[in-house]
Amino acid sequence: QDLEDEGHLPVRIYASFDEFPNLPFRTGLGNEKVRYGYYKIYVDGSLGGRGAYFSEPYNDAPEICGAMIHTPEEIEELVRRANNMGLQIGVHCIGDKAIDCVVSAIEKAYAENPRPDARFRLIHVLGINKELIERCKKLPVMFDIQPKFLSSDVHWAEDRLGPERSSYGFAWKKLIYAGFVETGSSDCHEEPYN
């Protein structure tokens, strides 16, 4: 904000945050250059580190399914609280089991408080499948995908997930044809921003 006030900010910033604010707050506060965006929740780990949480083990590590950062109950509470505060929500969820937990939490929170301005951003979603896509169609969900993953992850994703699961991992066209809004991001600092 100081750089913007001094006229030295050449870009627009839409900042996410991962802690609840202690003051009255809502998504969209700010100005043309610096605006508060969504409340971000991390649900599982990365595909590369085999931390993304899947319902079935990794193809190349049959003893591992990944891990959740929060319990399903904690995810439900975080999503419910953020939705009731009027915040947009962004959720890092890669594996199908993680996405399932998030979609279940959104279904409950949105049924409880169907705000007209609600927007739930699912980030990465490499483990999405047809059933999850159908459930998402009934919700104000959008997808935040990372085109850079096509050059960094696509070469080993099939070995990690197997052909069936990896067929949806980069199937962004399927999401567009299903009627979803997609945004692209760099996933910087994990990937270069250019």
Placement of each model-derived feature along the sequence:
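Active-site loop-helix segments enriched in His/Asp/Glu that coordinate
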Residues: 1-34, 71-72, 80, 93-115, ...
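Hydrophobic faces of well-ordered beta-strands that scaffold small-molecule active sites
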Residues: 11-18, 37-43, 89-91, 120-123, ...
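Active-site gating/metal-coordination segments in enzymes
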Residues: 18-80, 123-125
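Glycine-enriched alpha-helix->loop->beta-strand junction motifs that scaffold or abut catalytic
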Residues: 32-33, 109, 135-144, 178-181
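Active-site gating loops and adjacent loop-to-helix segments of metal-dependent hydrolytic enzymes
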Residues: 46-68, 109-117, 142-143, 147-165
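Short acidic/histidine-rich active-site segments
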Residues: 47-50, 87-97, 145-147, 175-194
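Histidine/acidic-residue-rich catalytic or RNA/ligand-binding cores of hydrolases
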Residues: 99-107, 134, 153-160, 188-194
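C-terminal helical cap
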Residues: 119-120, 130, 152-153, 157-182, ...
